[in-house]
Curated annotation (Swiss-Prot):
EC number(s) reported in the record: 3.1.21.5
Oligomeric form and interacting partners: Contains two different subunits: Res and Mod.
Lineage: Bacteria, Pseudomonadati, Pseudomonadota, Gammaproteobacteria, Pasteurellales
Domain notes: Has a helicase-type domain in its N-terminus and an endonuclease-type domain in its C-terminus.
EC top class named in words: hydrolase
Protein name: Probable type III restriction-modification enzyme HindVIP Res subunit
Gene: res
Single annotated GO MF: ATP binding
Biological processes annotated in GO: DNA restriction-modification system
Keywords recorded for this protein, A-Z: ATP-binding, DNA-binding, Endonuclease, Helicase, Hydrolase, Nuclease, Nucleotide-binding, Restriction system, S-adenosyl-L-methionine
Pfam family, one: ResIII
DNA-binding among keywords: yes
InterPro entries: Helicase/UvrB_N, Helicase_ATP-bd, P-loop_NTPase
Catalytic activity: Endonucleolytic cleavage of DNA to give specific double-stranded fragments with terminal 5'-phosphates
Family per similarity comment: Belongs to the type III restriction-modification system Res protein family.
Length: 514
């Protein structure tokens, strides 16, 4: 009796991810892998091949979509499809979206709604999907179905009879206002209810404000949202209700809509975990990403150095990485650094101080490096190897007969004013950080050969919304709880441009230097 109860409990606790992984194993054992084979139309019309974990995630999705009935989840096929892809930052979630757009187009869907909580994410994603001339465009130059060219268009309002792929890109604020504030040439809720939609929700952890608060409130329709509306206010006003009830389920009417969410950070709140037990289709966290060898290791360097010395210490690492990249023949390599201040005013002051320091830097300014090693704690922890990393850089200087004057000259050449940006716009008069469009463009193609940026000054731009994947160092320019600062030797990225690089040299660069 006890055994029966235990098996029943395990079945009740089973997640969709558990089920689909078990099902995949069974199909593989039965040599029925054709069941989850990727459609030729999808693979042929993407610019890049899939990484192993992307292919696995799509296979999981296909197993779910092609299975008509799930015994462990008897109601799941009686409601609109709602799935979540839980994948680490840098693992290629946008590539997954592109593949799923093609998949659903082949199934007959024509209207796609991409939404997120920040305008700058909307802007950078548009280019990935709709501009064939953009460096990060994810489809082939022409999407072909047989001999027919399939157009892909950015739209503000959907046409009822589209001959191609239509994507509406929007933020939470704009979607809310479109639905509840009727204006000419704007999408209304009635318009959306007349269509079959595939909704792509990026940074999906913002969908769970009401679940975390155990409250499913109705939208307050009296107040229009704008750029000044706080994130908390946006989420409080029913982001979750709007997407799930009004759009996905068409306010209780029959619906064939699809909601696909993407996030690297699903809240650990018990209610949220329960909500997604039958929705998570893949899990690929930072730990797994590191183990695959396609992202940078993360190391924490703590010290009691003053602000200027902390900056110069980071510049040592940047120079060292540059030298290692030259050694291994990695072209157009830029070890971009981010300097984080506590307030906007402090960030402006730190930015100006940095420009002054690098303009006037001398070899003698780096002399502290030979005496301060004792102030760093050595550690066996791979994430806390500041002393070891510094020793490696200094040994490299000695072994290769470099001097600090070479380091100073390199800094002067590579960190001029046009190589450094501050994320807060010079025209911004508000108390919150606001970036102008030109700076956003630079932030979102840091890896481009013609992008000159090597250093970024910011207050709170470590959250989602721009391409943090290209960072190699995050340097805190204010005191922490222990009274000192820290340099996090960081970086998280899966870059298509390095697919053909020799894997050992790519790994060596970061395992040695970060």
């Amino acid at each position: 009796m006890r055994s029966i109860k235990r098996r029943k409990k395990m079945a009740n606790d089973k997640t969709l991810f558990d089920w689909v992984e078990d099902r995949k194993s069974t199909l593989e054992e039965m040599e029925q892998t054709d069941f989850f084979a990727l459609p030729e139309f999808v693979e042929r019309n993407l610019k890049y091949p899939f990484f192993e974990w992307q292919k696995s995630a799509l296979e999981n999705f296909l197993i779910f979509d092609r299975t008509s009935k799930l015994k462990d989840f008897p109601d799941i096929k009686n409601r609109p499809t709602h799935l979540l892809f839980n994948m680490a930052t840098g693992a290629g979630k946008t590539m997954m979206m592109a593949a799923l757009i093609l998949y659903y187009f082949e199934k007959g869907y024509r209207h796609f709604l991409f939404f997120v909580n920040q305008n700058n994410i909307v802007d950078k994603t548009e280019n990935n999907f709709t501009d064939p001339t953009h460096a990060k465009f994810l489809f082939t130059e022409k999407i072909l179905q047989g001999d027919t060219v399939i157009p892909i268009r950015k739209v503000e309002t959907f046409s009822p009879h589209s001959d191609g792929i239509e994507i509406k890109f929007t933020s939470i604020q704009k979607l809310y206002n479109d639905i509840h504030t009727e204006q000419e040439n704007q999408t209304t809720l009635t318009d959306l209810h007349d269509l079959n939609l595939v909704m792509l929700g990026d940074e999906a952890h913002h969908l769970n404000a009401q679940t975390k608060g155990k409250k499913q409130g109705e939208l307050d329709l009296e107040k229009e949202m704008n750029d000044r509306t706080s994130k908390a206010e946006i989420e409080r006003k029913g982001w979750e209700h709007m997407v799930l009830e009004l759009l996905l389920n068409k306010n209780g009417n029959p619906s064939e809509n699809v909601l696909l969410e993407f996030t690297a950070t699903l809240p650990e709140n018990a209610e949220v975990q329960q909500k997604y037990a039958d929705k998570i289709i893949t899990k690929f966290g930072l730990k797994e990403f590191l183990q695959k060898g396609y992202t940078k290791e993360i190391n924490l360097v703590s010290s009691t150095l003053g602000k200027k010395e902390r900056v110069l210490h980071a510049l040592l690492f940047a120079w060292y990485r540059h030298q290692i990249a030259l050694k291994y023949g990695i072209a157009n390599f830029k070890p971009v650094m981010l300097f984080r201040s506590k307030t906007i005013d402090e960030s402006k002051a730190d930015y100006l101080a940095f420009l002054n320091w690098v303009e006037n830097v001398q070899a003698v300014d780096f002399s502290f490096l030979t005496t301060f090693l004792a102030s760093l704690n050595d550690s066996d922890n791979a994430n806390e190897q500041g002393k070891t990393r510094t020793e490696q850089a200094l040994k490299f200087i000695q072994d290769n007969k470099f001097e600090f004057v070479h380091l100073a000259d390199w800094v002067k050449q590579n960190y001029q004013k046009h190589n450094v940006i501050i994320t807060n716009s010079e025209t911004n008069k508000s108390k919150t950080e606001k970036t102008d469009s030109e700076t956003e463009k630079l932030l979102n193609n840091l890896e481009a050969a013609d992008n000159p940026i090597r250093a970024i000054f910011t207050v709170d731009r470590l959250t989602e919304g721009w391409d943090v994947l290209n960072l190699f160092d995050i340097v805190r320019l204010y005191e922490g709880q222990n009274g000192g600062g820290s340099n996090k030797k960081s970086g998280k990225s899966c870059r298509h441009r390095i697919r053909k690089a020799v894997n050992w040299s790519w790994r060596a660069l970061f395992s040695i230097c970060v």
